[in-house]
Amino acid sequence: MHRQQEVLSVFEIAGITCRVECREEAFWDLLTPRYGEFASDAVPELSLRVEVTDHPPEEVVAHWSGPFARMAGTDGVLSIEGAGFRGIFDERTGEGWLSQPCDRSPFETFLTAIYAGRLLREGGFFLHAAGIMAGNGAHVFF
């Protein structure tokens, strides 16, 4: 296991510890700047295995209709599907997988849905914010 994967294999966000498994160094290179400071030694509550695939052909992306990702949930199982990616997370076991190109967006979209569901079920809340950096400072919108 290379150093970046060791640092990022388990991280904690919003009080929920997640283990991410992926063999592709390029994927870890994408995640390190964003998640490196959240590394944790705690026992993971969730586990997500990521398989990096080739980017979909342009015609697949061009013919994809609808939102970036389609989410569905049935009997404690959350699924995601988009142009060139798909995955499943079983809330009962706390385990899932995601097959996607080397890109943060599918991973982060799926992780956000998993965390949102978990937080809402456990009495937490989910707050979305956006920020803009300008010449006169930073502005955060909730």
Task: Report each predicted region and the residues it spans.
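A noncatalytic interaction/capping subdomain that flanks phosphate/NTP-handling catalytic cores
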Residues: 1-138, 142
